[in-house]
Amino acid sequence: MTNQKTNINNNIDVPEPSIIDKLIHEPSRLIIISHLYIMENADLIFFKRKTNLSWGNLSSHASKLENAGYIEIEKVFRGKKPVTVLKITEQGRKAFDKYKDIMMNVFQV
C-alpha cells in the first residue's frame, strides 16, 4: 500500500495525511522544533517570547517533544541562575527532515 494518492485533476501524487507527523505539525511544537533545528538549543525564555504560550502550555508542548525523543530538556546554571534549555536530538533532527520533505511534497501539488 502506498502513502500517496493520485490527484484525479492533474495526476500528481499527494501524500496521505496519515504520514504527516502530527506531533511536529501542531503549530506550537512546530515553532519549537523548527527553531531548535536551526539553533540546536535555546532556553525556555526564548520560546516563551516566540510563542506567547503560558509557562504551563510551553512546558506541556516541550514535554511531548521530549517524550517522543525529539528534544532533550536540561536544567543548567548561567551564573547562579537556573535555566531550562531545550536541545534537539538526532532523532528530532531526522523527524523534522522527514516532516519538511513531506510538507515540501504537499506544497508542490
Language-model segments: residues:
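N-terminal helix-turn-helix DNA-binding core of bacterial DNA-binding proteins
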Residues: 15-57, 76-79, 85
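Amphipathic alpha-helical dimerization/coiled-coil segments
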Residues: 2-17, 34, 93-109
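Basic, amphipathic "hinge/linker" alpha-helix immediately C-terminal to the N-terminal HTH DNA-binding motif
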Residues: 78-97
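Short beta-strand "wing" residues that participate in macromolecule-binding interfaces
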Residues: 73
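Glycine-centered, phosphate/nucleic-acid-interacting loop/turn motifs that mediate DNA/RNA or nucleotide
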Residues: 69
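Short, hydrophobic-biased segments on the C-terminal half of alpha helices
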Residues: 62-63
